[in-house]
Amino acid sequence: MPIGYPLVKAMDKDRFISYFLINNALLNERVIFLCNYEDATDESIYIGMLLYLESENSQKPVSFYINSSITFPNLCFGLYDTILQIKADIVTICLGLAGGMSSLILAAGTKGQRFALPNSRIMMQEPLIDGGVNGQATDLAIEAKELMDTKEILINLYHERTGQPKPVIEKDLQRPRYFSAQAAKEYGFIDSLLMASNG
């Protein structure tokens, strides 16, 4: 059963009480929470949040929390490019899982400001085709070439963000590969682990 969207209570200087969706309240604090999304419309919402925060103040960092497994690369390239284009520092934090293309988003954060909680998992995998493939042999050949081109792009992007050699990344993409938070740090997805502050 869905839990719905929690509301946050706020009071202005005139003691007028209003309620905001929790995502809107977090956005006011420059916090974005990435969960699974399924189409380009969802991706555009996250891109819009980043562009809005950039226009509000390009000097203040944005905290980008990730608990997501995005399967199809074409649904994250726009978000990835936006993260790298804006001037504000993007602090990426994995809590739970950064799976599939979400691991690339995690690695896209500002160097030195990419984190994971101790029990987080990071997973990288070979790109998949959105919606499956059908049609004539020529159509299949076109899709196969696109898939190989996408894989090459991913290898280059992971290389840029993690520093791992391209042959290592190509081998690691052949099957889903899971990393503990510590292993993700050693691989180059993140820079540090965030340890519990309450002991």
UniProtKB/Swiss-Prot annotation:
GO biological process: protein quality control for misfolded or incompletely synthesized proteins
Database matches in Gene3D superfamilies: 2-enoyl-CoA Hydratase, Chain A, domain 1
GO MF term set: ATP-dependent peptidase activity; ATPase binding; serine-type endopeptidase activity
Superkingdom per UniProt: Eukaryota
Entry's Gene Ontology cellular component terms: cyanelle; endopeptidase Clp complex
Location within or outside the cell: Plastid, Cyanelle
Pfam families for this protein: CLP_protease (PF00574)
Keyword terms of this UniProt record: Cyanelle, Plastid
Assembly behavior: Component of the chloroplastic Clp protease core complex.
PANTHER family in the record: ATP-DEPENDENT CLP PROTEASE PROTEOLYTIC SUBUNIT (PTHR10381), ATP-DEPENDENT CLP PROTEASE PROTEOLYTIC SUBUNIT, MITOCHONDRIAL (PTHR10381:SF11)
Function: Has lost the two conserved residues (Ser and His) proposed to be part of the active site. Therefore it could be inactive.
Similarity comment text for this entry: Belongs to the peptidase S14 family.
Protein name in the entry: Putative ATP-dependent Clp protease proteolytic subunit-like
Organism: Cyanophora paradoxa
Lineage: Eukaryota, Glaucocystophyceae, Cyanophoraceae, Cyanophora
